[in-house]
């Protein structure tokens, strides 16, 4: 029976080659589209950190206009203002907590033949590395005092460390970023989160950052904004400080609790 139907298929293929090709292509396209949809759905629904996902919480506050909702009624913005993020860090009683912001800056590697490059930066607090199980290849995160003072400490990704230091243990060495010298305190091992859940506002499947800096440097170095910035009213005044005290949302905040 199988040979009979195989023969019929072969005769039909010879009789209508173009139609057979189109039908095969349509079936292949359908299978490809279905597999792509299944893969995306699997990645988006998978728990990226199952060992503690029930203890990690993303904080939202409603700072939006009293006259109109941010999006849907009773739905707060998906990010925070700088004022709210820093106040939460200072006053929240969580076991671990961190504010987050995305930025960018030029790193100038030392050595012949090494060109400056624009690095993806993540401004955060040192709790970030513990909360999200960041794997370290060398060193560790910066100290609590670096969070408080805005010490120019830096944690590099594995790829950035390879670009700047050829993959060597660079802890204790210096990196020039935005014209300032930073001390390397740690280098991450290969780390890929799919989805990159700690900041889905800028893309759940965006690439991981090249370097991580103390959050306070956002203010002291006046580092540029990146990602999504939304304001319900314009900042009062001019300059960088007026943005930080404005009602514009561009920051994230996470807490880890002892139990769910």
Q: Language model features by range: what are they?
A:
Residues 24-28, 56, 174, 181:
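Residues at or immediately flanking beta-strands
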Residues 21-22, 98-99, 196:
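Short, hydrophobic secondary-structure boundary micro-motifs
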Residues 1, 8, 23, 32, ...:
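Amphipathic alpha-helical recognition patches that constitute DNA-binding helices
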Residues 126-142, 152-260:
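Mid-to-C-terminal secondary-structure elements
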Residues 14-15, 256:
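Alpha-solenoid HEAT/Armadillo repeat architecture
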Residues 16-48:
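Short, strongly hydrophobic transmembrane alpha-helices
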Residues 38-164, 168, 178:
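Structured, solvent-exposed hinge/loop segments at the ends of secondary-structure elements
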Residues 2-14, 84, 88:
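A short amphipathic helical element positioned immediately N-terminal to and/or at the very start
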């Amino acid at each position: 029976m199988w040979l009979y139907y195989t023969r019929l298929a072969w005769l039909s293929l010879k009789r209508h080659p173009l139609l057979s090709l189109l039908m095969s292509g349509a079936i292949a396209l359908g299978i490809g589209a279905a597999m792509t949809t299944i893969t995306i759905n699997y990645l988006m629904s998978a728990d990226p950190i199952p060992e503690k996902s029930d203890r990690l919480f993303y904080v939202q506050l409603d700072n939006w206009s009293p006259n109109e909702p941010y999006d849907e009624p009773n739905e707060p913005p998906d990010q925070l203002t700088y004022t709210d993020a820093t106040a939460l860090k200072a006053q929240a009683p969580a076991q671990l907590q961190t504010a987050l912001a995305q930025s960018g800056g030029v790193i100038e590697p030392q050595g012949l033949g090494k060109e400056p490059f624009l690095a993806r930066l993540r401004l955060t607090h040192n709790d970030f590395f513990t909360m999200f199980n960041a794997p370290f290849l060398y060193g560790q995160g910066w100290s609590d005092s670096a969070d408080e003072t805005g010490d120019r400490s830096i944690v590099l990704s594995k790829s950035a460390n390879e670009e700047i230091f050829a993959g060597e243990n660079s802890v204790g060495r210096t990196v020039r970023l935005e014209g300032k010298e930073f001390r390397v305190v740690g280098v991450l091992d290969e780390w890929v989160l799919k989805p990159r859940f700690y900041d889905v506002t800028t893309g759940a499947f965006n690439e991981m950052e090249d370097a991580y800096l103390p959050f306070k440097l956002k203010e002291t170095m006046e580092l540029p904004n990146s990602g999504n910035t939304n304001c319900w009213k314009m900042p009062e005044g001019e300059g960088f400080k007026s943005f930080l005290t404005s009602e514009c949302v561009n920051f994230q905040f996470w807490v880890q609790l002892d139990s769910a």
